[in-house]
Amino acid sequence: MKKITLLLVFFMFVTSTYSQLFVKDGSYLYNNDNVVFVKQDVNLETNSNIYLRNQAQLVQGKSGVSENKGEGKVSVYQEGTSNAFVYNYWCSPVGIASGTAGNTNFGILLMNRPTSVTASDVITTTYSNGTTSSSSLVVAQHWIWKYLTANGSGLGGPNGWIHVQDAQTLEPGQGFTMKGVSGTDITTVGEATSNNPGNNQRYDFRGRPNDGDIYVPVDVDDYTLTGNPYPSALNVNAFLLDAANTACNGIAYYWEQDKTDSSHYYVDYHGGYGTFSPISLGSNGVYMPATFNTYNWDGSLNTTGSSSGLAIERKYAPIGQGFMVFGDALGTITLKNSHRAYVKEGSGLSQFERNISSQSTVVSSLQVPQIRFDISLNNQYTRQLGLVLIPDATDGVDRGIDAKSPAEDSLPNDVYFFLDNDNSDGSSWEDDE
């Protein structure tokens, strides 16, 4: 068995494949714009590092639970798309670098501010408003929450949300919410843009790379916040349609929020959940943008919305992307190395999220045949529905195709497809009917 030991500085500019990867104390591996594929485990000794830069990714191929070990760290960047008042949903690609083998917990203090191609400063925290500058990055810990199905009564209300703050209690595969920061950081670290040209803060995730089987609990008629837990892209279709993951309904729900929001009060929030239907393993899937609802002081849904979200490619979740899943049964679903892929963000199939000013989208040549309906309701907001035309659609709810609406309570003036006594944002129809 081939085992690669790195004793000195090693720069990588081409795709490389290893059986095992060992980086010695004081050494590092630098990967620029390519993929490192390791068939089995990664062992990073103390003070060793793997730097993934310019969309470089680490993919591992071992089945079963992780055997990664060591106190060295992987460093990988991801950019948020929100200001100090707007949420992004995240899922960390790394955990605490400890001596015990396997995946470990995460907390936001494992996120850094890049200062050069390889160096970074540890972030600090405050209570409510995050800030950034060319000398510091301050994250507001008050807005760090996770949503666990066993603790809640449904999406959209305060029940089930657990306040994490800066504690290292986010288990592998648990997603979390985090608001962005105000200010700009013009520091350049070898990437295409500066650290934060405005509402696009770059974060440096540093820790042990997550790997292998990661278990996510689900329950009947409830949601769980999870996401992509790996330092590589995640094939969301493969995850949702895995034959072992039938405890969820096969749909991913993505939070979108109006980027112009400038208040921390629930009543001033404008946001909602878009739905992604994978359709099939080979399909690019169908994403129905969120309808932006407003919320009451307790976090429950108000009676009107404001506008709609953006068309975003969702087949491959980029590093750090969080999303909700919905349970059809009590049990667990599993994220696996077999669901991972090397797909660069912005390739036409993978986007973290887009600011409304970023309108360019690569149109795929493999679109699912569909009809979209943009329905304006009282000139207040638009509900988009999708009708997918596929040969194997049934009259019932088709798993991974028909998307249950994420709104627990329908608005008084709204429109849906009605399937099996439930509201759906997307439906399917046999193309010969």
PLM regions and their residue ranges:
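A conserved hydrophobic secondary-structure block that centers on an alpha-helix together
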Residues: 139, 143-173, 182-186
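Conserved long hydrophobic alpha-helices within structured protein cores
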Residues: 86, 175-178
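Extracellular beta-helix/beta-solenoid repeat scaffolds
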Residues: 20-83, 190-205
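Bacterial Sec-dependent N-terminal signal peptides
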Residues: 1-25
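Compositionally biased Ser/Thr/Gly- and acidic/asparagine-rich
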Residues: 164-166, 170-171, 178, 182-433
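Conserved "landmark" site that anchors the functional core of diverse proteins
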Residues: 85, 94-141
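Extracellular, surface-exposed repeat architectures
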Residues: 56-108, 208-231
